[in-house]
Curated annotation (Swiss-Prot):
NAD(+) binds at residues 185-187, 219, 248-253, 271, 327-329, 373. One of its GO terms (molecular function) is adenosylhomocysteinase activity. Keywords: Cytoplasm, Hydrolase, NAD, One-carbon metabolism. It comes from Bdellovibrio bacteriovorus (strain ATCC 15356 / DSM 50701 / NCIMB 9529 / HD100). GO terms for biological process: L-homocysteine biosynthetic process; one-carbon metabolic process; S-adenosylmethionine cycle. This is Adenosylhomocysteinase. The keyword Cytoplasm applies. The lineage of its organism: Bacteria, Pseudomonadati, Bdellovibrionota, Bdellovibrionia, Bdellovibrionales. Belongs to the adenosylhomocysteinase family. Pfam families: AdoHcyase, AdoHcyase_NAD. Substrate binds at T83, D158, E184, K214, D218. InterPro entries: Adenosylhomocyst_ase-like_sf, Adenosylhomocysteinase-like, Ado_hCys_hydrolase_NAD-bd, NAD(P)-bd_dom_sf, S-Ado-L-homoCys_hydrolase_CS.
């Protein structure tokens, strides 16, 4: 659709998958009231303009590639948090020639004004804050159906929900048209690797998460700012002086632990990996088990990507009014199923619930055990998301235009020179002056003055 196309009322048609097809679906209030829709869309557009000034990587790609239209013919189904920053990503893909249908990858992460702004621009989007599980799946289905006879040919995913749905037998016909997948996050990459091991992955995929300019920036620096933002918006708690427990010391856990320590907390870390545990200890954190930490913590943060990190035995040991939240992708890290069955819950405000246990103690759960930084705040800052999303655009271009390089069905990473390009596109915004290698220096190091400057195995 053209960016300034007039909005149509949602209409339903029959499809092979027997799923109604509509042009867009955003918050109920916006769908029912044109004035609310217009107000939300205007607000969203103003914030998108501000975000663009903080997302130099995406804006540089628009400038560099707009005339070439490298994504002309790419029809992309996207499933990624529908935020203001994602709106800039979507419109960058459109600027480079792509057609888009979009849904969110989390039931609470959508910013309704961002979704309205994208819908008002004529781009099909299916997302609103506070989806039910049924609505969540319906929204993803809308990115699969509704393309017409041509169908779509690219997947841009975050967490693997769209990828997994596309691998269901009911969408086998649609899957045959897919060229490739780009996956944003740790959980989704793990899902792809499982599909490969099982021999079930149908198309090549690019792992965005392990690009250095994603994992070492989004996961680390992004969480370092957005975790505390979510906790403080939700609870107004004073972090200084508190005992905080961070489960997991990968990049997300590192950012979370340093964030809380920076606010004056005493931070305990739990880990399964001896290397990460040693890192945490060498950086001054006490490393212990959740069993030992449960009665000590005032604030608990899970950041593992695994299930059953905080379970019934931990809840029963916690202090009264302990705050529990998650910054991993899914709500399986905290055993919400057990908690919901074995406590009385009352909502304090949206995304903040008090659960009273059978022992009389209360536990404060944020974002219902889902992503606290997006459920209780607005997620990572625009600048760091520009790193991640620039990788996404380059990955879509790679898969779409260089298909010969990705004939084998596997999970790939972006080439090192593109990772370095992403970083380079963000330097001017920070006033960075980069030193240039002389020809003599380059010869001594056996590399091109233009890079790549590090081998693939370098860990940064």
């Amino acid at each position: 659709m053209k960016k300034n196309a007039k909005m149509k009322a949602p209409t339903a048609t029959k499809t092979a998958a027997k799923t109604p097809v509509v042009d867009y679906r955003v918050s109920k209030e916006a769908m029912e009231n044109p004035e609310v829709f217009a107000k939300l869309a205007k607000w969203g557009r103003e914030e998108i303009k501000i975000a663009e000034t903080e997302m130099p990587g995406l804006m540089a790609l628009r400038k560099e590639y707009k005339k070439q239209q490298p994504l002309k013919g790419a029809r992309i189904a996207g499933c990624l948090h529908m935020t203001i920053q994602t709106a800039v990503l979507i419109e960058t893909l459109v600027e480079l020639g792509a057609e888009i249908r979009w849904s969110s990858c989390n039931i609470f992460s959508t910013q309704d004004h961002a979704a309205a702004a994208i819908a008002a621009a004529g781009i099909p989007v299916f997302a609103w804050k506070g989806l039910t599980e049924q609505e969540f799946n319906w929204c993803i289905e809308q990115t699969i159906v509704g393309w017409g006879k041509e169908g779509f040919n690219m997947i841009l995913d975050d967490g693997g929900d769209l990828t997994n749905m596309m691998h269901e037998p009911r969408f086998a016909k649609e899957m045959k048209k897919i060229i490739g997948i780009s996956e944003e996050t740790t959980t989704g990459v793990h899902n792809l690797e499982v599909l490969v091991k099982q021999g079930k992955l149908k198309v090549p995929a690019i792992n965005i998460n392990d690009s250095v300019t994603k994992s070492k920036f989004d996961n680390l620096y992004g969480c370092r700012e957005s975790l505390a933002d979510g906790i403080k918006r939700a609870t107004d708690v004073m972090v200084a002086g508190k005992i905080c427990v961070v489960a997991g010391y990968g990049d997300v856990g590192k950012g979370s632990a340093h964030s809380l320590r920076g606010l004056g907390a005493r931070v305990l870390v739990t880990e399964i990996d001896p290397i990460c545990a040693l890192q945490a200890a060498m950086e001054g954190f006490e490393v212990t088990t959740m069993e030992d930490a449960a009665p000590l913590g005032d604030i608990f943060v899970t950041a593992t990507g695994c299930c059953d990190i905080i379970t019934d035995k931990h809840f029963m040991k916690m202090k009264n009014n302990a705050i529990v939240c998650n910054i991993g992708h899914f709500d399986i890290e905290i055993d919400m199923a057990w908690l919901n069955k074995n406590s009385k819950m009352r909502e304090v405000k949206p995304q903040v619930d008090i659960h009273t246990l059978k022992n009389g103690k209360q536990v404060i759960i944020l974002a219902k055990g889902r992503l606290v930084n997006l459920g209780c705040a607005t997620g990572h800052p625009s600048f760091v998301m520009s790193n991640s999303f620039t990788n996404q655009v380059l990955a879509q271009m790679e898969l779409f235009n260089n298909r010969d390089k990705y004939q084998d069905i596997a999970v790939y990473r972006l080439p090192k020179h593109l990772d370095e390009k992403v970083a380079a596109l963000h330097l001017d915004k920070l006033g960075v002056k980069l030193t240039k290698l002389s020809s003599k220096q380059a010869k001594y190091l056996h590399m091109s003055p233009q890079g790549p400057f590090k081998p693939e195995h370098y860990r940064y």
